[in-house]
Amino acid sequence: MDPFPLVAAALFIAATWFITFKRRRNLPPGPFPYPIVGNMLQLGSQPHETFAKLSKKYGPLMSIHLGSLYTVIISSPEMAKEIMHKYGQVFSGRTIAQAVHACDHDKISMGFLPVGAEWRDMRKICKEQMFSHQSMEDSQNLRKQKLQQLLEYAQKCSEEGRGIDIREAAFITTLNLMSATLFSMQATEFDSKVTMEFKEIIEGVASIVGVPNFADYFPILRPFDPQGVKRRADVYFGRLLGLIEGYLNERIEFRKANPNAPKKDDFLETLVDALDAKDYKLKTEHLTHLMLDLFVGGSETSTTEIEWIMWELLASPEKMAKVKAELKSVMGGEKVVDESMMPRLPYLQAVVKESMRLHPPGPLLLPRKAESDQVVNGYLIPKGAQVLINAWAMGRDPSLWKNPDSFEPERFLDQKIDFKGTDYELIPFGSGRRVCPGMPLANRILHTVTATLVHNFDWKLERPEASDAHKGVLFGFAVRRAVPLKIVPIKA
């Protein structure tokens, strides 16, 4: 018997084992994975907290296995800067969840498109047109009208002595503010059936995108859609895209029929202008999917953050008093804050930053993917690896923040730290080329809604015995309170 084939096979196996072992030694450290499931059984209900604990043992550049999905967890500003800035091109890809394939969203959405010509055009239209300083200034009166509506609703509840579900009120107001800015229209009314329909669709999309899906970790299951995620996503995405397409087509037809009519100061007008001028190589479907991203991402994250801000202020009466005093000194007898007042409200800004530090709405940001092998801090991150940035862990790191678990807005009065993507210890909106495009609008919404609620009313819990309910949270697209915050407005 010729021994050569056996020797060759043995050498091949040995070489493969050696290369694999050497490659494994160069990967970031992490807990040992179990067969098939990897480290999934270790995650618990709050993965961001689990990752933070594990990073204390394995370091700020850590690897785990989520089923067959190899994942690297980043837990320090230094490593976040390496990923998002120094090697931003390499880590500009996205891991695409099965739900995002609904209605081909992954092929059209700016949030999930690979960095290329289409992505650059969409990014450019956001930066230069939709969210430019001038565009935001032009549309602020539309938003002020919606803040007045929130004020009137709270006044009515105050007169009747009934509590407000802050999450629901913030959701409706955020949706109205976004609808006014995008379409010059009011999407929802308080206490209406239309409200519940919008709430159902947008929260449906958010919950499906945020729910753990076995098919994302075991690709062999994707064709079977065992949890029905893709089927449900197709329904919710389709309904929301249908509404948005209706608004866009209605505006296009109106412009054709009334070419001399005055233009509106909203984003939709800007987008139709861009389509007409052919300044960007984009189609109508790109814009409808962009609007979907803005509605779902903006309304869900802003709503969640406003609820956390109000909880923290309610739990810290002295902080609430400081915000009220500052607002009174700047606003005087005005009931609705003007966006131009924001630079004169440093304590309000500090409150929002501190809440974002403690409660980043998306604690792990949107997942990134390595487009090629890359060595970071001496460790190999292989092509195709998912990369998660644990913004929550960085916000609670005692080496970065004094008393990290305490709500202390004053820390931001002494530090020139912002959440716009250059200070990596505070990046709730991300950073680099994948930073959230809607951040300028979200920033204004968070400050103006908080100011309107705090300036005009004192607040008390509807059920004081529920004061410890903030301890439970629900992990998903955004990490929200497990028990909705219901508080009673008292006319100040």
Curated annotation (Swiss-Prot):
Q: How does it sit in the membrane?
A: Single-pass membrane protein
Query: Which reaction(s) does its UniProt entry say it catalyses?
Result: abieta-8,11,13-triene + reduced [NADPH--hemoprotein reductase] + O2 = ferruginol + oxidized [NADPH--hemoprotein reductase] + H2O + H(+); ferruginol + reduced [NADPH--hemoprotein reductase] + O2 = 11-hydroxyferruginol + oxidized [NADPH--hemoprotein reductase] + H2O + H(+); miltiradiene + 2 reduced [NADPH--hemoprotein reductase] + 2 O2 = 11-oxomiltiradiene + 2 oxidized [NADPH--hemoprotein reductase] + 3 H2O + 2 H(+)
Q: Which cofactor does it need?
A: heme
Residues bound to heme are 436
Bilayer-crossing residues are: 1-21
Residues making up the signal peptide according to the UniProt record: none
Name the enzyme's class. Answer: oxidoreductase
One Pfam family name from the record? p450
The family this protein is said to belong to: Belongs to the cytochrome P450 family.
**Name of the protein in question:** Ferruginol synthase
Q: Which species is this UniProt entry from?
A: Salvia fruticosa
Gene that encodes the chain: CYP76AH24
